[in-house]
Design a protein with these regions (language model features):
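S-adenosylmethionine
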Residues: 1-239
Length: 239
């Protein structure tokens, strides 16, 4: 464990630090989220024997244990595998069937596919600046059967300048320092640094400044803790 990170976390959550450290080494929980564009809950519950209790974050998802990426129903887009709490962000957005939505940092596509499942005559723009990740995003959208959408691979400033106030809702799952990945990858614990946090915070601030020009309602999702993380960034950008 990175000593600088450990010291920082002890300052933020002194009474919970032991539980937090234990949680990093606990088995990673995963959920299977139903894709309403292709199926319904009753069908999946009748076919997928590995579904466990319903997710507390999404009424259309179940906790699962194991590896099901090669399951035929996953391969054909009937469900999407993601961490349970990840689906809570889109649920909080109150997506309406006719909304025009922008997912500004969209790859690999879990939240975009969830948004698409709530749209009827609305439209989704899913953007990913890195071309290779944009290809993964497009592949996942095709697998999930999403139609009323487009995938872009643009700088956020260029995209948002071209589409001022065009969106009813915007989601920014901004690149961050990787603290949310520490449970998955040991390297994220070792490579953490304050310099990287400052770099990520500057990048996030730029993305948010671009995004607000294109929005009606804005939703920010970050896993970074501290004054240079979610709270401080929101205070700088939200009136």
């Amino acid at each position: 464990m990175n000593e600088q990170f450990l010291k920082r976390m002890k300052e933020y959550i002194p009474e919970e630090i032991d539980d937090y450290l234990k949680s990093l080494d606990a088995p990673l929980r995963q959920s299977a989220r139903m894709n309403p564009l292709k199926t319904d809950k009753e069908f999946l519950e009748s076919r997928l024997q590995f579904l466990q209790e319903p997710s507390k974050f999404n009424r259309d998802a179940w906790i699962v244990s194991g590896h099901y990426g090669l399951d035929p129903y996953h391969q054909t887009g009937l469900f999407y595998l993601q961490e349970p709490s990840a689906s809570a962000v889109v649920e909080a957005m109150d997506i309406q069937p006719s909304d025009t939505v922008l997912d500004l940092c969209a790859a690999p596509g879990s939240k975009s596919s969830q948004i698409a499942g709530k749209l009827k005559d609305g439209f989704l723009v899913s953007n990913e600046i890195m071309p290779k990740r944009a290809q993964i995003l497009l592949s996942n959208m095709e697998r999930m059967g999403v139609e009323n959408m487009m995938v872009t691979s643009m700088d956020t400033k260029v995209l948002c300048d071209q589409m001022p106030e065009a969106f009813d809702k915007i989601l920014v799952d901004a690149p961050c320092s990787g603290e949310g990945m520490m449970k998955k990858h040991d390297a994220a614990r070792d490579e953490w640094s304050l310099d990287n946090i400052e770099l990520c915070a500057a990048r996030q601030k730029e993305i948010l400044a671009n995004a607000v020009r294109a929005l009606h309602v804005f939703h920010l999702h970050l896993c970074q803790r501290g004054k240079r993380g979610s709270g401080g960034l929101a205070a700088e950008n939200v009136p």
